[in-house]
A protein has these predicted regions:
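N-terminal leader segment of winged-helix/HTH proteins
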Residues: 1-25, 71-73
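Hydrophobic structural patches
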Residues: 7, 35-38, 128
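Hydrophobic recognition helices of helix-based DNA-binding modules
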Residues: 14, 18, 98-101, 105, ...
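N-terminal helix-turn-helix DNA-binding core of bacterial DNA-binding proteins
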Residues: 16-60
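Short glycine/proline-centered loop/turn elements that form peptide/ligand docking sites
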Residues: 25-28, 60-63, 67, 117, ...
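Charged, amphipathic alpha-helical coiled-coil/dimerization segments
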Residues: 66-126
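C-terminal regulatory/oligomerization modules of transcriptional regulators
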Residues: 119-149
Length: 149
């Protein structure tokens, strides 16, 4: 399928850029992705939200968070209001990695969007959002049908 094959090219390029950072700091791709996710989405700072938003497995997120804690890159804090609510925060030690990640993300965006007008960039974002929303809808329907059986 054309879209699927092309999407993998984009993902491969992003992973190439991020793999340099992973190698430099001794991180797995998942650990790096979690650090960048927490930086870019501070409102989604629980393990459950990382799983939900990133469509990752609970076990991979849990294992990666434990490793990030051991490397003193993140910290888990229990909510004062709700003992079951554990929030995850980036620590100062993660700042250098996140900065390198931001630079890689900027380079990625600059390179893959090269030659596009502002209007074309806007159109791409809108079309991609529609595609993702359609996929989300069908995933939701599929899960609902499975749960009904």
């Amino acid at each position: 399928m054309y879209f699927w094959d092309k999407h993998k090219t984009i993902t491969s390029y992003y992973e190439l850029l991020s793999s340099r950072i992973c190698d430099q700091y001794g991180l797995t791709q998942m650990e790096y992705d979690i650090l960048m996710f927490l930086h870019n989405n501070p409102q989604h700072n629980t393990a459950a939200e990382i799983v939900k938003v990133r469509k990752s497995t609970k076990s991979h997120v849990s294992t990666s968070l434990k490793k990030l804690e051991n490397k003193e890159l993140v910290e888990r804090k229990q909510s004062k209001d709700n003992k079951k609510h554990i929030e995850i925060f980036l620590l100062d030690k993660a700042e250098e990695i996140v900065e390198a990640g931001i630079n890689a993300q900027k380079q990625f965006a600059q390179n893959v969007l090269k030659g596009l007008t502002e209007e074309e960039k806007y159109m791409c974002i809108n079309v991609f959002d529609k595609i993702c929303n359609n996929a989300e809808e069908y995933l939701r329907e599929y899960k609902e049908n499975i749960n009904e059986k």
